């Protein structure tokens, strides 16, 4: 599995935030793989807030908590050249009950995942 990120801001973040985002991506990939082992494709995953919390166009929100940090990751899952790809379009560190990230994520509704992939940055590989 390869992790790509669409936003350049990732590289300006503190190392602990970068590590948390990568850890969240690996956790998400493990959950998706668990479904695939049960012959349930990503497009058929419904009613599981731990994988697809909210939908924004062709992207989904993944909620992840590490220590006191609450992450919201806007992602899509692709298979390119027989490789699993998690494409992170955006992310937010959520503070208290602030839901401003929803409007930020909604702004990406019209983004085509393949076009975003072509302009994304490779950040990690995980199995």
Residue spans for each PLM region:
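Generic cytosolic/nucleocytoplasmic N-terminal low-complexity/intrinsically disordered segments
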Residues: 1, 54, 93-94
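Arg/Lys-rich, positively charged N-terminal/basic patches that mediate binding to nucleic acids
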Residues: 1-34, 115-127
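Intrinsically disordered, low-complexity regions
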Residues: 8, 25, 29, 37-43, ...
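Intrinsic disorder/low-complexity signal
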Residues: 12, 47-48, 53, 83, ...
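Alpha-helix capping and helix-coil boundary motifs
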Residues: 14, 36-43, 90-91, 112
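A short, surface-exposed loop/turn module that caps and links secondary-structure elements
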Residues: 34-65
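Enriched for short, Lys/Arg-rich terminal
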Residues: 62-127
């Amino acid at each position: 599995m390869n992790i790509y990120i669409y936003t350049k801001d990732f590289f300006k973040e503190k190392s602990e935030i970068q590590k948390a985002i990568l850890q969240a991506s690996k956790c998400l990939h493990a959950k998706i793989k668990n479904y695939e082992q049960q012959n349930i494709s990503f497009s058929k995953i419904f009613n599981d807030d731990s994988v697809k919390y909210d939908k924004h166009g062709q992207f989904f929100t993944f909620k992840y908590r590490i220590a006191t940090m609450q992450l919201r990751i806007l992602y899509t899952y692709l298979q390119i050249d027989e490789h699993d790809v998690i494409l992170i379009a955006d992310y937010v560190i959520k503070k208290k009950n602030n839901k401003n990230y929803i409007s930020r994520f909604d702004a990406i509704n019209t983004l085509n995942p393949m076009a975003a992939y072509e302009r994304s940055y490779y950040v990690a590989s995980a199995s």
